[in-house]
């Protein structure tokens, strides 16, 4: 289901000068023969970014997942890029979230970085994020203009690919703009904000239970803290209330 989008993502990264980097030992790929599930992951070194990760889970008709997060260099205070695409083939259900994830919720910060995403939401009104914002804390790492898609095969094959391509193009444009001007948030503060993002996300990651069910707790714990959110082990924080996707039933 998501292989064409995965190739589009990787192609766009290569065009921007990206090169693959080493994934921690044992985390590049994991397979569960009994459940016929396979997860593969990539790390990219991209000019202007300190880290760009991509993961693809293929569990046949049961579940398809494409996930990616891009972390800009600390001297660039632009939002992270985050996307989560899930397809439940047996139920013909799609859940997709695409967002520029803000480091802070300051009004001037949002005005400076989110004009492009605002325009995309106007261009794709069927992907308004109003519904999904009930599932997450809007005062943290989600923007008011995230693109949210829930539907069946028609949205998966029509609306999503077009929005996905436009979303990537918009983020690259934002990065090019920010690369030409000084960041307003000091690099040391951006670093702390990105660490806080990893901590926050690791504590609430809705996919951790899913990965555990397919690949076991030991592997999934390593995947969470060594690949998905590696900065989450570098500081302590108080456990928050759990959050989860509103997945199809």
Curated annotation (Swiss-Prot):
GO terms for molecular function: 15,16-dihydrobiliverdin:ferredoxin oxidoreductase activity; cobalt ion binding. It catalyses: 15,16-dihydrobiliverdin + oxidized 2[4Fe-4S]-[ferredoxin] = biliverdin IXalpha + reduced 2[4Fe-4S]-[ferredoxin] + 2 H(+). Signal peptide: none annotated. Pfam families: Fe_bilin_red. Gene3D superfamilies: 3.40.1500.20. Its EC number is 1.3.7.2. Keywords: Oxidoreductase. The keyword Oxidoreductase applies. GO terms for biological process: phytochromobilin biosynthetic process. The keyword Oxidoreductase applies. Catalyzes the two-electron reduction of biliverdin IX-alpha at the C15 methine bridge. Belongs to the HY2 family. This is 15,16-dihydrobiliverdin:ferredoxin oxidoreductase. It comes from Prochlorococcus marinus (strain MIT 9303). The gene is pebA.
């Amino acid at each position: 289901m998501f292989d064409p989008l995965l190739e589009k993502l990787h192609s766009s990264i290569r065009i921007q000068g990206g090169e693959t980097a080493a994934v921690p030992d044992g985390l590049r790929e994991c397979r569960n023969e009994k459940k016929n599930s396979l997860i593969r992951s990539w790390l990219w070194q991209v000019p202007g970014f300190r880290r760009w990760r991509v993961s693809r889970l293929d569990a046949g008709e049961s579940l398809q997942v494409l996930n990616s997060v891009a972390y800009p260099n600390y001297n660039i205070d632009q939002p992270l890029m985050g996307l989560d695409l899930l397809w439940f083939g047996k139920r013909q259900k799609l859940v997709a979230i695409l967002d520029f994830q803000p480091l802070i919720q300051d009004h001037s910060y949002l005005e400076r970085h989110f004009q492009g995403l605002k325009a995309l939401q106007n261009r794709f009104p069927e992907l308004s994020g109003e519904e999904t914002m009930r599932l997450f804390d809007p005062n943290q790492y989600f923007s008011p203009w995230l693109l949210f898609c829930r539907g069946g095969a028609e949205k998966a094959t029509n609306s999503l690919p077009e929005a996905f391509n436009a979303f990537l193009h918009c983020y690259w444009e934002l990065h090019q703009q920010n690369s030409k001007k000084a960041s307003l948030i000091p690099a040391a503060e951006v670093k702390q904000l990105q660490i806080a993002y990893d901590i926050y996300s690791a504590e609430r990651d809705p996919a951790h239970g899913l990965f555990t069910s397919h690949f076991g707790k030991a592997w999934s714990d390593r995947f969470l803290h060594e690949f998905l959110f590696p900065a989450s082990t570098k500081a302590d924080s108080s456990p928050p209330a759990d959050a989860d996707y509103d997945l199809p039933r």
